[in-house]
Amino acid sequence: MRPILLAGHERALTQIKYNPDGDLIFSVSKDQQICVWFAHNGERLGTYRGHQGAIWTIDVDPTSTILASGSADNTIRLWDIKTGKCLKTWDFPTAVKRVEFNEDGTKLLGVTEKRMGHLGTIVVLDIKIDVEAEQSDEKVMTIVCDESKATVAGWSYLSKYIIAGHEDGSVSQYDGKTGDLLYNIPIHELNQPITDLQWSQDRTYFITASKDKTSKLISSKDLEVLKSYTADTPLNSAAITPKKDFVILGGGQAAMDVTTTAARQGKFEARFYHKIFEDEIGRVRGHFGPLNTVAADPTGKGYASGGEDGYVRVHAFDKGYYDFLYEVERERQNRLAAASA
């Protein structure tokens, strides 16, 4: 897998997102700009300028019409993907650490930071997927996290629940319409923050990454832990691959804790685990510094990772990736082939 190296940022990457068709990659970093790239060849399409602080998060609506970003300048901004025009700015008392559209793109949630006497919150905004439309200033719903602040959050299937990962390692399920807390379950080690939360394609389950060196596959409906993946380094990001039953984990020693310069020492690799059997099946090296974000191409053709080194690396899967099967999987395939013959 020879990667395409995307060098468009001057500082550490914070999040990468593919659009739903998998043909565009959006990347954000601490250098205050959003870049958009063609996924197949790594050509830069353009940048979206306007934020006045590090950008923590990005999301694309299901039709690839508008883009939402959250930043340390205490704003969420909405952009016209095609023209790069900023359509709307919402102001908050603290930094915005995560944004995510729901399945049909009509709502956007934002996770705000706990700072300066303000509690961490999850806010919901109504969105019109139309670049000409006037977007509403009103926040439809605000969930206050008075126990432990939310670090990540997202919408489950049919926008039924809002799922949030917290700084204390717990996961919460809120009612998507009323904002009522339904469950709060300790999933990761106490006080080991959850660093990422990414969905399966149908949003019935999701994967978390945590500083406790583990990643969990969890059901959206009842927050039951379905699978657990153990790594040897704190994790910053985790993604579920479509087409094949794998998950990709990214992490590495925190940049400030790295004392040796050898890339192997810091464990700066993307790790592939089998989603069902929980075994590590391979690693992809390349970043010079921790991986801050990984994203799987929704069409199943590859994945991208963004590191503390300021680079985005886009990998296209080769034949060996698709052919790889466990013995039991191969036997099952042969049985099915024999049955249909």
From Swiss-Prot:
Q: Does the keyword Cell inner membrane apply?
A: no
Q: Pfam families from the xrefs?
A: EIF3I
Q: Where are the WD repeats?
A: 8-49, 50-91, 135-184, 189-228, 286-325
One biological process term from GO is: formation of cytoplasmic translation initiation complex
Quick check: keyword Iron in the entry?
Answer: no
Instruction: Provide this UniProt record's keywords sorted from A to Z.
Output: Cytoplasm, Initiation factor, Protein biosynthesis, Repeat, WD repeat
Mention any one GO cellular component term assigned to this protein in its UniProt record: eukaryotic 43S preinitiation complex
Molecular function (GO) terms for this protein are: RNA binding; translation initiation factor activity
InterPro entries xrefs? eIF3i, WD40/YVTN_repeat-like_dom_sf, WD40_repeat_CS, WD40_repeat_dom_sf, WD40_rpt
Major place of localization? cytoplasm
Q: Entry's PROSITE patterns?
A: WD_REPEATS_1 (PS00678), WD_REPEATS_2 (PS50082), WD_REPEATS_REGION (PS50294)
Give the highest taxon in the source lineage: Eukaryota
Question: What are the disulfide bonds?
Answer: none
Question: Where does this protein reside within or beyond the cell?
Answer: Cytoplasm
Q: Hey, which family's this protein in?
A: Belongs to the eIF-3 subunit I family.
What the protein does comes down to:
Component of the eukaryotic translation initiation factor 3 (eIF-3) complex, which is involved in protein synthesis of a specialized repertoire of mRNAs and, together with other initiation factors, stimulates binding of mRNA and methionyl-tRNAi to the 40S ribosome. The eIF-3 complex specifically targets and initiates translation of a subset of mRNAs involved in cell proliferation.
Record text on subunit structure and interactions: Component of the eukaryotic translation initiation factor 3 (eIF-3) complex.
Q: What is this protein called?
A: Eukaryotic translation initiation factor 3 subunit I
Recorded source organism is Chaetomium globosum (strain ATCC 6205 / CBS 148.51 / DSM 1962 / NBRC 6347 / NRRL 1970) (Soil fungus)
